[in-house]
Amino acid sequence: MANPTLFVSYDQNGKKLSFANWISVLSPQDTPFVSMTGKESINQTIFSWQTDALASVDGNNAHVEGSRAEDGEMKPTVIKSNVTQILRKVVRVSDTANTTANYGRGRELMYQLEKKGKEIKRDLEKILLSGQARTDVLADQYLTNSATDPAVVGLNDTHAARKTGAFQFLCAHGGLAGGVVDKTKNGPADPDTGAVTVKVAQNASNPTTNIGFDEADIFDMTLQLYTAGSEADIIMINPAHAKIFAGLQENTQGSRKRIFENTKQFIYEVNSITDPLGQSYKIIVNRWMPTDAVYFFRSADWTQMVLRAPKRTELAKDGSYEKWMIEMEVGLRHRNPYASGVLFTAAGKVAA
């Protein structure tokens, strides 16, 4: 004691800690795509659906009075299919850790299970929005999503993990590269309308820039979707693309300007656009979106096919701990390959 006649806090022993009884988790937990798309229960790992198209418009559909009715051409429906994917998280907590009292939580096991539940939902969001190709040891026995691009086969390995075809794979893409959709190629044209709904951005207004897209690319995609008969009303973007959409409010030619009259607010955000055809799109920023793609879609056209909903299962106890598993099995279905659009940013585009 520096001063034996004055007892200060530094001289105290056995002081009670001042510890906040809460835990701050800053990690983002929002999952827009998983939250906005519907769910449907299934009872098989492989699920299928059918698509069809009308015959081309016949501008010469005129016939002589009293003529014989000739047979017309008819085509069968097209079968599409995808598979479910198993997502899993495991928690193991010692009996001692699960018994001790802690600040900010009750039992350690329950806290860790809650965290893993949120993590598996984020994993699902990231996977479904990727370019992941369908992978299945039986993929060669079922019709696939593109006649020019069969699904990846798991080398006939019975232990290969199934992977559900994700967003880009279920759109009319232009091929695969290393087990994911090739981002350097346009997709095939719709046989019915000629629309191309998976495209690489040209970024024509910035020909010396090797990445990005511009207004012309955006409205070209909305035109392609209109031509295909799509009812897309959402544009989902990575946060890095928000500035490009905000730039639609003005242009360098001076023919379009933002007006800040009688206001002290500076608003740079663009949260919806209406294209020259009168189609309105809501812009949704999603941190789990690929940085090299922009998606145009209607949420009702996408469905999570759930074989097993997320479930907590206690595993066998063979030591002084508790071990639990959270597991789910789900796949993705797209109503029609041409119902949604993918605009790949012009990565690697050679300057003109």
Swiss-Prot record:
Keywords: Capsid protein, Late protein, Virion. One of its GO terms (cellular component) is viral capsid. Its main location: virion. InterPro entries: SU10_MCP. It comes from the Viruses. It is found in: Virion. Assembles to form a prolate capsid of about 145 nm x 44 nm. This is Major capsid protein. It comes from Escherichia phage Phieco32 (Escherichia coli phage phi32).
